[in-house]
Each structure stands twice: as C-alpha cells, then as structure tokens.
Amino acid sequence: MRLIPLHNVDQVAKWSARYIVDRINQFQPTEARPFVLGLPTGGTPLKTYEALIELYKAGEVSFKHVVTFNMDEYVGLPKEHPESYHSFMYKNFFDHVDIQEKNINILNGNTEDHDAECQRYEEKIKSYGKIHLFMGGVGVDGHIAFNEPASSLSSRTRIKTLTEDTLIANSRFFDNDVNKVPKYALTIGVGTLLDAEEVMILVTGYNKAQALQAAVEGSINHLWTVTALQMHRRAIIVCDEPATQELKVKTVKYFTELEASAIRSVK
C-alpha cells in the first residue's frame, strides 16, 4: 500500500486529479479501448473534481473515451432529486467535461428489482474487463461506498441498510433532518472495489483520523471495511495532515520519506 501524506485538502485534490489524468493519458484510450474509471460522491472528492475540470479546460485531458462507474446510489430517491448521486455527479463533474452520456454508469435506485439491477451493474463492469482506477473516499467509521461496518470483505454490488451514524452524517444534505435521508442504498461491494486494477482512496480531516489509522496500522477487519485495501496489490491512500493525527509518528515519517518525490510534485 502507498500512503501519500500531504499538507492540506487542496494538495490532496491536486495530487489525486493529476494522478487520474496521468493514468488516463498513459493509457491512451480510444472508442474501442476506453479507460474505465470508478468514482465516488460526498464532500471529500469535490475539490478533486474541481481540479479535474481545471485540467480538462487547460487541454491536459479528455474524458471522451473514459467510461465511469459510480460507487453507489440511494434507493427510492428520484434521479432528479438535488441530493441524488446522479444529480451530484452531473452538477459537480459530468456537466463540465467532454464525457459521453453513453459512458456514464450509475446504479438505479428506483427499479422494481434491486437485486437484478445490482447484477446488471456487475455484468456491465465485467463487460469492460475491469475498472482501471477506482477513486473513493472513506467514512468516519471506515466504510467505503456504503459498505458499512461488518460488511463482507468479498461482497458484490447489492442493497444495503444504512447505519444510524451514516444517516446522521448524511442528514447535512437533507436539511439536517435524519428522517429525510433514504434508509437504503445500492452499493458496489468490497470485492467489487478490490477487483479494480488500482484503488485510490482520499482521506481528509481530523474526523477521518481513526479510519486512516485502522487502514494503515490496523489489522484487516470487517468492522473497518477500509482495511480491505491492505489486500490490494495497487492501493493508494492520499491524505492531508489532520487525517494523520492517530498514526504513529514513525509511520508518518516512513511514508513521508518513502513518497518524498510524490509529495514534492504538488505545491
């Protein structure tokens, strides 16, 4: 596992956006051979999306031959709802770049058969071979996507009941009313994420420090689903200084020295 300990949120955004752009450009995608990118929602990746849009506008990358798969979507929330993840992605990213509509994949939380929708999503991913790079965030309790604590570390895309902690955390998007937050979501599984060729997780803020400590220094544990990254061959965690507060000093020192060139690449 790589850990890139940066100073602040802006550096995390710039570094992660540049990493994605470099991966796309190295791949040299075409219509017949697209680059497949996994994407998250939430507050953490917002600045990364802003940085990606800036790089696109500067002519440094095209998303025309990039296929995207989002991590999750609420059940029962119309696509047009301002807090649906469909709305989030178009507002904060898709509407600002040259991605083709046909290449955008987001789970549909309004079908009559959720299991069939989840199976369809898995098969759609497999039809492209694999996801080349999956970017994600992490919850305060260490969850990735909506794989809440005690999720199977080999799980696939499925419907999940959201925990009280997640409902409370997400209520800030629903007028701070926990009763307005959907109780269920469709989400990729931990196993689905681990199938990606490369996984990059963004961790920012003091409130994510325990999750980062579990991911880097803890043992693999289904109560902290982020720890599953330890089993991945090409996992990267990009974090800011506040998120490292629970890590041992020698751990931060080790990765700071190991990733010195990567850290110097962003200002």
Curated annotation (Swiss-Prot):
It comes from the Bacteria. Pathway: Amino-sugar metabolism; N-acetylneuraminate degradation; D-fructose 6-phosphate from N-acetylneuraminate: step 5/5. The active site is at D72, D141, H143, E148. GO terms for biological process: carbohydrate metabolic process; glucosamine catabolic process; N-acetylglucosamine catabolic process; N-acetylneuraminate catabolic process. The keyword Transport does not apply. Keywords: Allosteric enzyme, Carbohydrate metabolism, Hydrolase. Catalyzes the reversible isomerization-deamination of glucosamine 6-phosphate (GlcN6P) to form fructose 6-phosphate (Fru6P) and ammonium ion. It holds the Pfam family Glucosamine_iso. It comes from Pasteurella multocida (strain Pm70). Homohexamer. It catalyses: alpha-D-glucosamine 6-phosphate + H2O = beta-D-fructose 6-phosphate + NH4(+). This is Glucosamine-6-phosphate deaminase. GO terms for cellular component: cytoplasm. Belongs to the glucosamine/galactosamine-6-phosphate isomerase family. NagB subfamily. The gene is nagB. It is an enzyme of class 3 (hydrolase). GO terms for molecular function: glucosamine-6-phosphate deaminase activity; identical protein binding. Disulfide bonds: none annotated. InterPro entries: Glc/Gal-6P_isomerase, Glucosamine6P_isomerase, Glucosamine6P_isomerase_CS, NagB/RpiA_transferase-like. Its EC number is 3.5.99.6. The record marks S151, R158, K160, T161, Y254 as: Part of the allosteric site. Allosterically activated by N-acetylglucosamine 6-phosphate (GlcNAc6P).
